[in-house]
Amino acid sequence: MGQDENSAATRAQDREKETLILSNSPVTTCIKFRLRSLFDVEASQTNGKPLAHSLSAASPWSPTGQGGVLRLKRFARRVNRWGEQPEMCGIAGYSHSVPRDRNRLSRALDSIAHRGPDQQGEFHSSSISLGARRLRVIDIEGGDQPFSTADGNITLVFNGEIFNHRELRTELEQAGHRFRSKSDTEVVLAAFQQWGNVAFRKLRGMFAAALWVSSERRLILARDRMGIKPLYYCMQDGEIYFGSEIKCILTHHEVSRRLSLAGLNCYLSLNYVPGPHTMIHGIFKLMPGHLLEWRNRNAQVFSYLASRTKDHAPASLNEASEELDALLGSAIREQLDADVPLGIWLSGGLDSSTLLHYASAFSPSTLKTFSITFNGRSFDDGAYIREVSRNYGTEHAELNLDSDCNLIEAIEAIAYHADEPNADAGAIPVWFLSQMTRRNATVALSGEGADELFGGYLTHKADRYAAIAHRIPEWLRKGAYACAQMLPVSDEKIGFEYKAKRFLKGSLLSPEYAHIYWNGTFSEPEKADLFHYADARPLAQILNGMKSGSGLERFLQFDQRYYLPDDILAKVDRMSMAHAVEVRPPFLDPRIVDFAAGLPEHFKLNRAGSKLVLRNLMRNKLPKAVLTRPKTGLDIPIHEWFRGVLRPLLEDTLNEESIRRDGLFRWPVVRSLLEQHQARKGNWGYHLWGLLTLTIWMRRWAIEAPNRWTPAPLPQEEVAVADSSLHWQPVWSSAEIS
């Protein structure tokens, strides 16, 4: 079952069009960028003449001048590698036991055109339709998708990039494979041919992939081990629908838009929807490090990670730091490899400053850095950001995000691109940061993952302190919490009042519930008061895995399995891809993940502080103020904005008519939250943000809410959804293939 015969003609037409639009293509943009970095001259200065004629022969930047030959050789090596670079894209597909309108696939791909605006490719057989949207970085033809084996038996659509694709290419060539392109997509395809499902353990990168094996009538979906790239699926009447974003699946009229009560129960507690749940009944996330195999109208989900024992831990903190030094250097060097403008998201904190330190050592040109700043002493990190930027001489751009920015328009756009509501208000600054980045760069390095690997969050410190607090009689802890309630309300970012109230209440909970409460919003009693369909079972099932661990590690594993992919990485992927920006997180290189998992806890967190191995590594490298500053995160003054610029949006959206019509929440409770917040009797900004984004998202996607007048218990299939995806498997348990 080969590709549709029309696809070849379509590609031929596309190639003809490419000759007409080349002057505005990504290739031309890339050439201009590379020429500027090589010769320090704008392409427009050549006035259409050969570059050598536009530069003085005496100029050191001339091809015949001092250093020019070396620069041309370097440029030639770059050109020779063009096509090896990965590309951003999105994928979609569906099965069909009966013939269907092929425009279905086009509609699904159109919904994610922002992920890959340059090329659309489709594959159709009697059983399956696969498609991809691609943002071409360099290779105009060689990397176009779908990509099939020479015999046409296996077809692949792929989103992401494989950083070790050159190593794998060499290994596969030695095994007899011959390549037709320099694309990493073809390397993934050949790896699957060679090793089958085991191939996914060998991939070092970020990806979501779909492969169709025609001879076996088998579809395989795969997602990278940390969940950097998203992949969703839906099974209905024996057919499967999948895509990089939920909106791909919603283009199919058979797919219900019914609200998932299990997803909403988790969302109200966690601020995000943990996999495999989504906020739409019947649509699921493929869990990180998992495969889905669909055959004969049935699907099976399982982990492709291989269990192994932890490596021998370093004997000392200095030894651990030396090992991390080598791993970080290798990962960042790999991820700097791009023939398009590249920058670094700089927060002025330890993680992003570390990336900049290494990148500056490897980059031959001035690095670009991008930052968001805020008004207000507790929210503004500008002083740290600018100090780090000056130290490394970056070409720096920053945006002060205040009430004058078009916040309401951004919130509406976020509701479209986010696919699911996310009560993490950090989506707003990431939206504006991505927007600013796109004007200057196509790729950005970012520090996601370091906190989850090395114990960098305030919640990890709170977990440690709570273990001590539990030795204090409960009546005394309750008394301390009652006293904390009398503290005056403060709008400071993670101020003393907020931390005291949150910690003392969490100290009255079990360790598992305390961990999520410190980072979430509604406690279980608060949720029961608010939500007509409150049910503790979905969250309890998610938390069960945390009970099997001990100490810090169980909390880190939970954060890596759920919080990182379903909140942090999901937020970054949707906001950046909405602007066609690729964000790379070097800390999530599998080698660093395995290294972190093998470290003893006291190399991560102890009385001396957090992320100790990383701080020790960067000692005497970064400014002391950066090394010693407390963790704050990219947060916004949402409490203040809800009393000011966003108050009309808040009150127009969460009004009595709207709340009663949806039938999800009790209006008196919502009204009380609104009134207490405006009267400064409590800071309910985070809680209200979660309800606001949920309501806007439901309106935008016409999501069907259950009728409050006919309440029913949570469907059992939502409680026990995708059990094979919920088994507790540490994400570090990857093994080299022997």
What feature does the model see in each segment?
Residues P86-A418, V430, S434, R619-N620, ...:
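Cysteine-centered catalytic environments shared across enzyme families
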Residues R225, W431-D491, Y563, I568, ...:
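Active-site adenylate/phosphate-handling loop in enzymes that bind or generate adenylated species
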Residues Q85-I91, V198, T251, S260, ...:
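Adenosyl-5′-phosphate
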